Regions:
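Short acidic (Asp/Glu) and glycine-rich catalytic loops that position anionic groups and cofactors
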Residues: 6-12, 80-87, 138-139
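Structured core elements
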Residues: 40-41, 55, 78, 88-90, ...
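A glycine- and small/hydrophobic-rich beta-loop-beta segment
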Residues: 76, 82-84, 113, 117-118
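Glycine-rich phosphate/pyrophosphate-binding beta-alpha loops
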Residues: 85-87, 91-97
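A conserved regulatory-domain signal marking ACT and ACT-like small-molecule sensing domains
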Residues: 102, 107-223
């Protein structure tokens, strides 16, 4: 709905790429914090020449960004425009007071006969063309990976070689000491790359006998 308001066009809700937070583990939160990030569930909509891309998924956000510090009942909306650059709106999104205020505002509008269109303009004035997410050019971004592997010689070399073969370069590698024979998480962050290349590389990595579980993949928001 926010995308429809922002871009004055009907949005194909079925085309929104959605990943939840169920697969986020305490390990991810710990290593994200160690690397200088917080994990937040973000909904994003971007307008491109080919349409509007929409995603809802957890991302690593640098602690230096204001949106990283939105916690508790607070919600935030970040807007980026051609002339105003970036605007951040923060407010309470839960609780008796904020909910009552929103309901009261709607009731007052109804009593006054104020009935603006849901999306700010009538649907007849929205741009008729479909966003068609498949026509949106793919952008590049950095990624966080957590790979659970067996403690065997050459495992990391195989993973690094696979990423290299898909033109993905590494920025950070974290592997903590452990007892011999134990399974170990390997934490990687990459330089910006396409998600298509990343998922292709992970299909190969996850098929390795030394990789014990599907690799955790989270995008990293640029600072």
């Amino acid at each position: 709905m926010l995308a429809a308001i922002a871009f004055a066009r009907p949005v194909d809700f079925d085309a929104v790429h959605v990943d939840g937070i169920r697969h986020i583990s305490p390990l991810d939160i710990h290593y994200a914090d160690e690397l200088g990030y917080k994990i937040k569930l973000l909904g994003q909509a971007k307008r491109h020449a080919g349409g509007v891309s929409q995603t809802v998924r957890p991302q690593l956000i640098p602690k230096s960004l204001p949106v990283a510090n939105i916690d508790g009942v607070l919600n935030a909306v970040v807007m980026r425009g051609s002339f105003v650059d970036e605007v951040l709106l923060v407010g309470r999104g839960a609780g008796g007071g904020p909910t009552a205020s929103a309901v009261a505002a709607d009731l007052i509008d109804i009593a006054r006969g104020i009935a603006p269109p849901i999306f700010g303009i009538t649907t007849g004035h929205m741009q008729a063309e479909s966003p068609a997410n498949d026509t949106v050019p793919e952008s590049k971004q950095a990624y966080y990976l957590r790979v659970s592997v067996k403690d065997e010689p050459g495992v990391f070399a195989d993973i690094a070689a696979t990423l290299r073969d898909h033109a993905i370069s590494l920025e950070t590698v974290v592997q903590r000491g452990h007892e011999p024979g134990q399974n170990v998480p390997v934490i990687l962050t990459t330089h910006p790359s396409s998600e298509t290349a990343m998922r292709s590389a992970l299909a190969t990595i996850d098929a390795m006998d030394t990789v014990l579980a599907p690799t955790q993949l989270l995008p990293i928001m640029p600072a």
